[in-house]
Design a protein with these regions (language model features):
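Alpha-to-beta junction loops
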Residues: 33-35, 51-60, 103-104, 138-151
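Short loop->beta-strand "edge-of-pocket" segments that line small-molecule binding or catalytic clefts
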Residues: 1-2, 97-110, 123
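Flexible hinge/capping segments at coil-to-helix
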Residues: 75, 88-104
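Short Pro/Gly-enriched coil loops immediately N-terminal to beta-strands
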Residues: 72-84, 167-175
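Extracytoplasmic small-molecule ligand-binding "clamshell" domains
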Residues: 1-61
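A ligand-binding cleft/hinge motif common to bilobed small-molecule-binding domains
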Residues: 45-48, 62-70, 116-119, 143-172
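Short helix-initiation/N-cap motifs at beta->coil->alpha
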Residues: 20-23, 37-48, 92, 110-111, ...
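A bilobed periplasmic-binding-protein/Venus flytrap-type ligand-binding module shared by bacterial periplasmic
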Residues: 84-93, 173-186
Length: 187
């Protein structure tokens, strides 16, 4: 888990790891009769942890893509995301996915959001976490960022004066599942 991506996984005011994915993982562990052990890391290294056998599963808002499904077994979807293009409030240049062409964005490099941004012609700056992404956006160093619609609303709840907005939503929802090594029967 990243521990930096509210409302999925983040730290509360007492520095406890909390969020929707933490609750999902705890429920899975309870059903399996095991204790959940949470290991935090940067997004770009989490799937590699499954490859190396360091982690059994990754519960961190992982979109089920064709490419990932070729490499990992996935649980049934447990959530659906809509990708939001988030911009500064004054930005009226970006109003559709196609308007990302030639623009700058920031995301963790191996995320689905980075792939979508690149698909629409945006240049992606790699970041370590969500806070870094919003810092770049608010400072005007990038034109936009792509993320889950729910993540935007959660950020605005915590930062109601942030001068950002959703410019548009990708019309297609993504399915969120739990990846594990191919052939793992805990599915």
């Amino acid at each position: 888990m990243e521990g930096t991506w509210a409302p999925w996984t983040y730290h509360d005011e007492d520095d406890n790891l909390v969020g929707y994915d933490v609750e999902v993982a705890q429920q899975i562990a309870e059903k399996l009769g095991v204790k959940a052990t949470f290991v935090e890391g940067e997004w770009d290294g989490l799937l590699a942890g499954i490859d190396s056998g360091r982690y059994d599963i990754m519960v961190n808002g992982v979109d089920i893509t064709e490419e990932r499904a070729e490499k990992y077994s996935f649980s049934d979807p447990y959530a659906y995301n809509r990708t939001a293009v988030i911009v500064n409030s004054a930005n009226d240049e970006i109003q559709s996915m196609e308007d990302l062409d030639g623009k700058s964005t920031a995301n963790t490099i191996s995320s689905t959001y980075a792939e979508v941004a690149e698909k629409y012609g945006a240049a992606v700056t790699g970041v370590d976490d969500l806070e870094q992404t919003f810092e770049l956006l608010l400072s005007g160093r990038i034109d936009a960022t792509l993320n889950a619609e729910v993540t935007y609303y959660d950020y605005m709840k915590a930062h109601p004066d942030a001068e950002i907005k959703i410019a548009c939503l990708d019309p297609e929802s993504t399915k969120v599942g739990i990846p594990m090594k191919k052939g793992d029967e805990t599915k």
